[in-house]
């Protein structure tokens, strides 16, 4: 006797024996679920680095605990506005601007659960700054940015667990700088950027290579989205661009962003870190650089609340490095 097929209910949970991960069904697809994080004395750790004017300082904090940031160590050199990403154990800092208006091809890495100075990982194939990063447990991708040749549409990737030089991934739809990058385990999202003060959102499939595809549009944000993006495995958050606006999208589908809430004050080029439940937005220009930090709950919607303070006022640095962001 054959059994009639049954519709899978939204919210159903399964164990995928091929990937060794838990998954939840969200209406049209199965999405991986974060079910563990390294033991880091209270929860997942967020890391930010660099600053404008140029700095090599790395700071960290425990995302579930409202408190001030602490010194972690130093980058290999002073720089800001590069791309970054992480696995559960390693954080990568790619490219950047050493000032004035220089561009680097250096890639540094840290072991997130410890403290100490960054170590050489390898080099990008093309030096760049003012771009963004996307990552999952396996790969970290440097997206766009610019150098002396102008704005770039190239994407470059590395395998996080090894060391070595970056390889070509594909191209974005247009050459841009100042984008925001956010990731699920499957997809990387690229939002906003300039020139053209674009409000477009594009996506890539991290495990493959290829060109970015259209996802939808931001409602109000665009231009300087750099640093103001983060995600859980299900939802991406976009903030910054010198406004208080926070917007969100559901990563597995395509479509335009929706209103999420507001930050406590306007920020441009802030830092963002998440443990896939709480998102922390810190630093940025208000219009001068600030050391303030605020948090949101990604699974709901609402306005930012006070979190604590950075070691020093910081903007335009590296971010999206944590042990439990949406790509993990």
Descriptions of predicted regions:
Residues 1-328:
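Polar, enzyme-active/binding microenvironments
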């Amino acid at each position: 006797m054959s059994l009639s097929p049954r519709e899978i209910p939204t919210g159903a949970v399964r164990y995928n024996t091929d990937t060794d991960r838990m998954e939840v069904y969200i209406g049209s697809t199965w999405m991986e679920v974060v079910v563990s994080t390294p033991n880091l004395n209270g929860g997942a750790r967020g890391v930010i680095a660099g600053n404008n004017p140029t700095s090599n300082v790395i700071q960290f904090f425990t995302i579930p605990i409202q408190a001030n940031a602490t010194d972690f160590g130093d980058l290999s050199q002073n720089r800001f506005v590069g791309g970054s990403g992480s696995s559960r154990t390693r954080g990568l800092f790619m490219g950047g601007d050493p000032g004035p208006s220089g561009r680097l091809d250096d890639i540094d890495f840290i072991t997130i659960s410890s403290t100490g100075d960054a170590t050489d990982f390898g080099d990008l194939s093309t030096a760049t700054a003012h771009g963004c990063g996307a990552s999952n447990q396996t790969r970290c991708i440097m997206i766009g940015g610019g150098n002396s040749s102008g704005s770039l549409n190239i994407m470059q990737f590395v395998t996080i667990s090894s060391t070595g030089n970056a390889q070509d991934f594909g191209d974005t739809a247009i050459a841009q700088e100042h984008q925001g990058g956010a990731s699920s385990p499957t997809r990387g999202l690229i939002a906003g950027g300039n020139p053209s003060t674009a409000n477009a959102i594009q996506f890539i499939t991290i495990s493959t290579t290829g060109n970015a595809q259209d996802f939808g549009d931001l409602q109000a944000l665009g231009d300087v989205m750099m640093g103001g993006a983060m995600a859980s495995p299900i939802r991406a958050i976009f903030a910054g661009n010198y406004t208080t606006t926070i917007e969100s999208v559901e990563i597995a589908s395509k479509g335009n962003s929706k209103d999420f809430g507001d930050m406590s004050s306007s920020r441009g080029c802030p830092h963002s870190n998440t443990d896939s439940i709480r998102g922390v937005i810190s630093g940025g220009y208000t219009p001068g650089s600030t050391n303030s930090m605020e948090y949101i709950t990604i699974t709901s919607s609402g306005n930012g609340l006070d979190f604590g303070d950075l070691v020093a006022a910081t903007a335009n640095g590296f971010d999206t490095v944590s042990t439990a962001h949406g790509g993990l």
